[in-house]
């Protein structure tokens, strides 16, 4: 599937873009939303002009991408979700995940309805917790995980045109993950759009969006750390 890389993005973002467009329409056309009438060009969406459709599609994709930010953190720091890692340090893992969830839920509880507060608290708390766990560990586990993964995948890469058991296995779990990503993005869009629709004002909504995507920015730090460690400790030739 490496030669059809675009299929990954089509699977991952097409449905999310459609749901994102619906979310944008909901947020701007719902009288109870803080974004009601924010986009004047959508007031007469029933005309379905090319400009309106293009604008909604573009905003839908942007909303989809923002909503999917927690998935990037999960993907980058997934080494800390392995059973062997959790079993080795259960208390540290629990503290790094539960404390941010409790704090995030408590803060959101003041401004959002309970269902939205709990949903956002769990997503954002897990998001921050994994990023913090990776930083406190100085990315050691992530470095080991990616090195082991690269070593395991190397034979399959050299035989990429062959239907080897390893290639079939990798293709299978990638398909599963990408379809899972698509549905997880939809779930995150529902949570985020509900939270934004029930937010007290646009200022809080902006803060919520910043907090929602902030831990995902740590992926740049993780990538840079892996690059630096590869330069210092390259794979044997």
Language-model features, listed with the residues they occupy:
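C-terminal transmembrane-bundle signature of multipass membrane proteins
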Residues: 168-237
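Transmembrane alpha-helical segments of multi-pass membrane proteins
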Residues: 83-106, 120-129, 170-184
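Membrane-proximal helix-loop-helix units in multi-pass membrane proteins
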Residues: 97-162
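Juxtamembrane/interfacial segments around transmembrane helices
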Residues: 59-70, 141-158, 226-237
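Detector for Asparagine
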Residues: 3, 37, 52, 137, ...
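N-terminal first transmembrane alpha-helix
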Residues: 1-112, 204-216, 222, 226-231
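Alpha-helical membrane-embedding segments
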Residues: 71-79, 151-174, 178, 185
């Amino acid at each position: 599937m490496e030669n059809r890389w675009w299929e990954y993005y089509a699977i991952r973002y097409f449905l999310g873009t459609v749901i994102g467009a619906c979310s944008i329409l909901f947020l701007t056309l719902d009288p109870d939303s803080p974004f009601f009438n924010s986009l004047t060009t959508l007031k007469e969406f029933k005309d379905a002009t090319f400009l309106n459709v293009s604008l909604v599609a573009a905003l839908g994709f942007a909303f989809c991408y923002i909503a999917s930010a927690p998935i990037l953190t999960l993907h980058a720091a997934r080494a800390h979700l392995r059973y062997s890692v959790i079993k080795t340090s259960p208390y540290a893992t629990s503290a790094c995940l539960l404390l941010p969830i409790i704090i995030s839920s408590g803060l959101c509880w003041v401004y959002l309805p309970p269902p939205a507060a709990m949903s956002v608290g769990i997503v954002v708390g897990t998001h921050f917790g994994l990023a913090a766990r990776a930083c406190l560990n100085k990315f050691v586990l992530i470095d080991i995980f990616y090195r082991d993964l690269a070593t395991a995948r190397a034979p399959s890469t050299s035989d990429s045109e062959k239907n080897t058991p390893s290639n079939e296995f990798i293709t299978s779990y990638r398909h599963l993950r990408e379809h899972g990503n698509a549905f997880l993005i939809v779930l995150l869009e529902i949570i985020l759009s509900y939270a934004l629709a029930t937010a007290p004002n646009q200022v809080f909504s902006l803060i919520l969006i910043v907090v929602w995507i902030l831990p995902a920015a740590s992926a740049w730090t993780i990538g840079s750390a892996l690059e630096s460690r590869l330069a210092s400790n390259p794979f044997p030739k």
